[in-house]
Structures are given as structure tokens and as C-alpha cells.
């Protein structure tokens, strides 16, 4: 299904199914592209209910007609949740919508199942951590979804016996976690911008910064998308270390955190590119439009005024998420909850300018919240 002919002639509307952190990322970039944002979530207290232009609270599985009706006034529908039942349902009714669904369901089923993903990596010769190594340290992770819950390093053989059934056991590969998004239209695949994923002790991401072009990583990511004939978006994660690149997972769904860093460092809006994948098609990227620096991070304010890095697991427990402060090169979002969590975005022509803006942003938190910076 192609986009409506009125595309570009009026304010475009995107309907997001999911009101948590993936939804926030997609809503943020949709607004940057000048779109009207509708969010649908069955939770009346959905985290981004107040950030959306329109919020509709209903269960799409129980009341699908409401979603079909909303699709009549939307240019596209984008699932932004990892609820298996919800994704399966959207897959079963995808032909009933009046607008395109910006999602590759076939690629998602492979990417969601980490065992299937590893078989896929092996089938096209992609380097990946060794399965069930003979001796520790081991890295264990859940078999499904992109969650970091339960992921950890194990140094003792005995601990392996007490693992939850189905957990994946791999060699522990030392290095940095790097990420790269690819958007495909089924025939052409745009590899976008490398980012460094800064993780905490629970393997949850608390900061994202851009990286220079990595030809090997780009080539591997392109192959992963091309061999699936990807029509949609896919996030490729790897460990970059002394042993070279090892691909740890793919996720064929709209990511959170990295797209904002990609937007400010490269000038590419992944939502706009995703729309093109289902419309006029995408072009493979020879040169990125911009080469800037961006710092994207989450900080929680403690009672004593200290700011500590936190990941999405903490953020997702919030009650409301939205804009707090904005000026050129600085954006601050506030996630209300038991303790306030700030998402800070700083960008500039280089690392130094972004760093100066970070200092200013932190001083704003000091003035307004008494944060110790």
C-alpha cells in the first residue's frame, strides 16, 4: 500500500500503538518532522499520554474497529511496543488498515527470537559470540525481546546450573556496545549512523553518543537487512573490542534512545526515512547530511541532590514524560515518578561545543532543582 496522495500537501499524521519509551522516541521525531501524533495505549496512565497530540485509551485486541477507524485519518501506523500478543494481533489484521503499517513483521519474528537470530547470523557468515563456550566467563541473556533484564556475566560454572530455563549462554566478549540502524524498502537499504551505547551494571543504556563511520559494521548491517529483504527498520547491536566486531543482536522495531542521537549527529530523521521506505523508497546513504556531535543521557535526581546515570528500566517506571526545557543545542525532558529522571540532549558542531552545552544544561538543573553538579 502506498502513502496517500495528499502526503506533503497537509500536516501528516502518524498513529503510534504504544505509549512507553519506544513511543516517546517515535513521537519526538515525528514532531520534529512536523507531524501530528496520535498515541494508542490500553493503559490510561501511559507514560507519554500528555506528550501526544491525541491520546486514545483502549485495548486494540478487544476493540480493533477503533484502531481501523483511526487509521482512516492517519498517513501511517507504527507499532512501538514489545507486547507479543499486540504485535501478533496487528500482524493478523494488517490488511484491514487504511494506511501503511511501518513494520516488517517477518523480520521482527526472527529478531525477537535470539536463537533464530543466531542461526540467521551463522547462515550468512556474520561474526557473533560463540554459543555455550567450554569455560567461563559466560554472558547470559534472555531468549526473547530486546530487554536487558536478566543479562549478566557469569564467572562460576556452578551458577550455570541455576539459570532460568531457556536463557542463552554465550562467550563473554570484552568491548564497547555499538549500534547501527538500517531502514529498507525491501530492495534498497539505508545504513544510517553508528552510535556508542553506554551501559550500566545491569546492561541497561544510560547514554548514547555518535561514533565515526565503521565500514565493517556498515557492511555487516547492510547484509543483515538485505538478506531479510527488510521493509521497515532494524537496529543492529555489536560488541567492538580486541576480537573485532561481534554482532550480539538485531531488533526489527523502532528503537528508543539511539534515534535522537542519530538525528542530531547525522541530520537524518529515522521516522521520515521510515515513511519513505513505504512510499517513494529509500536511497542507500553514500554520505550523511551532517557530521555533528550529540550527547543523549538519562540522569536521576536523588534526595541529596546528586544526579546518577540510570537506564530505561528506571525511566519506564515513571508516571508522566514530557518537555521541560529547550534552547538551541539543549533539550531537557522530565520523567516524573518516585524520583525525577531527566533525559538530557545536547548537540553542537563538535564534542567540545556539545560538552559546553551539557555544562549549561546541568547548571539549569542546579538552579531549578538544587542538583549537585
PLM-predicted stretches and their roles:
Residues 171-229, 240, 251-278, 287-291, ...:
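ATP-dependent carboxylate/phosphate-activation module, predominantly the ATP-grasp catalytic core
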Residues 108-177, 184-189, 195-200, 205-223, ...:
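Active-site nucleotide/adenylate-binding loops and adjacent lid/helix of ATP-dependent enzymes
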Residues 230-236:
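Active-site-adjacent "lid" and substrate-binding segments of diverse enzymatic cores
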